[in-house]
């Protein structure tokens, strides 16, 4: 990812962008709009296909070369004009050199007709970093998944069924990698039966390569001065489903109603993602209101725990950060959240070495190193060291994010009721005592470690870690703090009249009453972060017994990745894949015995602000048969079945 860079552009006398790297235009100099409508929209018969979509149905477009986003915006404009209200559009596009936001704005200004759609795209075009980036528009009716990186690296990671392809890289002679047999094979793997394809080129080697991959191709009239272009239909075999224990359950058909148990961030995000797709969701919370447990802290930090080695957790964090950061634009900045940045201090030699590796691996607009003097000027207080600065990060008031998500139309909240789930016929029923409060064909468990109270999830290896935060009254002197600063703990600039300081880690205690010892421990964490800020707060003179705070349980898994996805019936799973206990390399051709309509979203640990909202989108994609918003390997690394598989291979049953 260290080679990730934005597009380098030149601008011609008409204000149109040209790629400096490829020496080519992004669209027709005569009429880019008409070219897009002819080559991509008409060739793929999108007007009639959009109009024919049923309620809840989705059409997925795949694109090679996002460029200025012109093709996406034209497709969205057409979709909005002709598609039924209950239909949805998913658009997946790969781009190695995304435009910087200022360049994108300048390019899209050429098309005043598209201004409403362009402004919506520009409003979401932030925290756009390498990997999979999920953007949502029109209340969730239109989804855009950007794969930012080399197409030959990104497309093999994609799990999708594409109905229509836009092949729109720069000209084959100038960008041959985008027109290679390897790429055509990926298009075939990702294609739905009878998927259509349009491209501006008529090059013979492109036509032959697509035919070899399984597309029936023909030359058709091109646009403008271009005599011919290519049109095609996929007629090859369906792709191999892969390992059955990670295969998709059949997309949900029938009544689009769901129960979501748990009113924290994971539950609210899960409910919002389904409701945005037209589902009726009953959100059930045992407390009187939302965000009363780990999601209830006054300030949480958007802290990116990254690795220079592209681990599944690091890729999840990078994609999740962008998604959350875009969601936060809905909230009141300065009250519910603030993009004040996060500074991670290089508090010892090992941490300094880790930070140097990260700075070399990621773009500077995501993170960059600061010397001590630079860090102090930025933070506004004296610090013991420099560190790594994340300029787009900051703090969030998690209850506000939960409330915003739960306000999505289609969600009904049932609070103050603890429930158990029972399968009755084709529905899951939520019982409080002998009373069935709600029923639906689908249920999502999002109650952190308490998902183990539900028998199907009882054996999942989740653990609870108690954490306590301390609230400190802001002083005129402490208000100088301008960014979140982290070492072993963290301290945030004030929200209103209070700073939040934390957080402790206690692996043994089951008591949620705040303790003086942990308040003292948090003050020691603050002393390590900045003795100057400790003094500005007058913290040494504050009686511990007068300090306020709260404690909650984080929920984490043995590999520190969340559990997000469908759940299998354990005994049937063990029987279906018993051969793996003898030879883990076997892939039995037996369908996974899913528990019908049961899904999990749990185990987010201390990074739920980053991972839980995108996990809601991941669940919705599993359920609705949409493109996964994460690389397939990352989705599998978060799959609940990984622990059933691990126990089976290790011979650990029961």
From Swiss-Prot:
Q: What is this protein called?
A: tRNA 5-methylaminomethyl-2-thiouridine biosynthesis bifunctional protein MnmC
For the biological process aspect of GO, one term held by this record is:
methylation
EC annotation? 2.1.1.61, 1.5.-.-
Question: Which InterPro entries does the UniProt entry name for this protein?
Answer: FAD-dep_OxRdtase, FAD/NAD-bd_sf, MnmC-like_methylTransf, SAM-dependent_MTases_sf, tRNA_MAMT_biosynth_bifunc_MnmC, tRNA_MNMC2, tRNA_S-uridine_synth_MnmC_C
Q: What does this protein do?
A: Catalyzes the last two steps in the biosynthesis of 5-methylaminomethyl-2-thiouridine (mnm(5)s(2)U) at the wobble position (U34) in tRNA. Catalyzes the FAD-dependent demodification of cmnm(5)s(2)U34 to nm(5)s(2)U34, followed by the transfer of a methyl group from S-adenosyl-L-methionine to nm(5)s(2)U34, to form mnm(5)s(2)U34.
Which portions of the sequence form the region tRNA (mnm(5)s(2)U34)-methyltransferase?
1-235
Q: Where are the residues of the annotated region FAD-dependent cmnm(5)s(2)U34 oxidoreductase?
A: 261-654
Is this entry keyworded S-adenosyl-L-methionine? yes
